[in-house]
Every structure is written in structure tokens, then in C-alpha cells.
Amino acid sequence: MTEKEKMLRGMLYAPARDETLLAELAACKAQCQQFNQRAYQAEGIESAQMLLRRLLGAAGEGLRIEPPFWCDYGWNISVGRNFYMNHGGVILDAGGVTFGDNVLVGPQCGFYTSGQPLDAAKRAQGLEYAYPIRVGSGVWIGGGVRVMPGVSIGDGAVIASGSVVTKDIPAGVLAAGVPCRPIRPITAADRMLP
């Protein structure tokens, strides 16, 4: 089994030992760099967004990502319709990241599917793991949020700025903290606010 196959199955894998993974990482970094350069030029905004569509595994209508943006592979990211990510987004997508429709992501957010074992000997061997992240539809993620490997965020949830999401968050709640936890349901009264 290749290191890439292990990665995609959620097993420990060594990315530095797989020429395919190394080549894909390098190609993705070059594409991200190209996107970031074009997106800062007024005449390059449209071509930058087209680059994103080629980079990502799947993207619905209304895709908008502000530069700078970085990801590991790109092909392992799927975004629904009307996806918006503000400046400074990072998606480490080895385990796969899926966003539903109408998702808003604040500035300086990170989605990290990759992690290293707690065992120092395994880390010294260059091993890591990757677990998928799933973000439902209608989710708003505030600035500076970090989402850790294997987490799911339910439809309509709001994640407060600065949170570190280490466990699943149910649908329809306001969640906050380090570690992030549900604070309260989003109610009809919340829908009355501007």
C-alpha cells in the first residue's frame, strides 16, 4: 500500500516517503502562490478565481476565497454553493475537507486534517495521520478559528472567533472556546437581530 493510500484511509503515513504526495504538494503550493499573486491585482481577480476552481476538488457557484490562501493538495477540498473564505485561510486537506452551501469563514482560519502521533518515536519516523473535516451548510466560522482533524460541524452552527474546535459541534448552536463547546442553541430571537 502506498503512503497516499494510507493517508486516504486515515492510517499513519509518511508523506516524505511518497514521491506522488511530494509532487502533489509542490504543485499545489505553486498553484496557491499563483492564485495569491493574481488575486492581489485588479485585472487578475477573475483569473485567480478560475485557478481556484481548477485547484479544488469540487466547487459550487458563488465561490470566493480572499488571498492569501494555502492548502496542501486542493483536490481533497469540496465546497458547496456560495462559499466565502476571508484573508489568510489555510486548509491542510490530506484527510479531506467538505463544506456545505452558504458557508462563511472569517479571516485567519485554519482547517487541519493532519496531525502527528503523541508517541515521539513515531513522530521521529516522519509519521502523521489525516482525518476528514466536515462543515455543514449555513455555517458561520468567526475569525481566527482552528478546526482540528476528524471534526464535523452541523448545519447552521456559528463558531465564535478564536475558538479551537476539537470535537463535533451539533447543528444550530452557537459554539465558542478553547476547546470549543456549544454555548446555546440559535433561537428565533437571534433571527430578529440584524
Where are these regions (language model features)?
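Conserved catalytic segment of ABC-fold P-loop ATPases
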Residues: 154-157, 170-172
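C-terminal/domain-terminus segments
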Residues: 156-165
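Short-chain dehydrogenase/reductase
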Residues: 140, 158, 174-176
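Flexible glycine-rich beta->alpha loop in the catalytic core of nucleotide-sugar glycosyltransferases
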Residues: 109, 116, 163-164, 170
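Flexible, glycine/small-residue-enriched loop-and-beta-strand segment within the central core
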Residues: 69-79, 84-152, 178-194
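Terminal amphipathic alpha-helical/low-complexity segments used for targeting or macromolecular assembly
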Residues: 1-62, 180-194
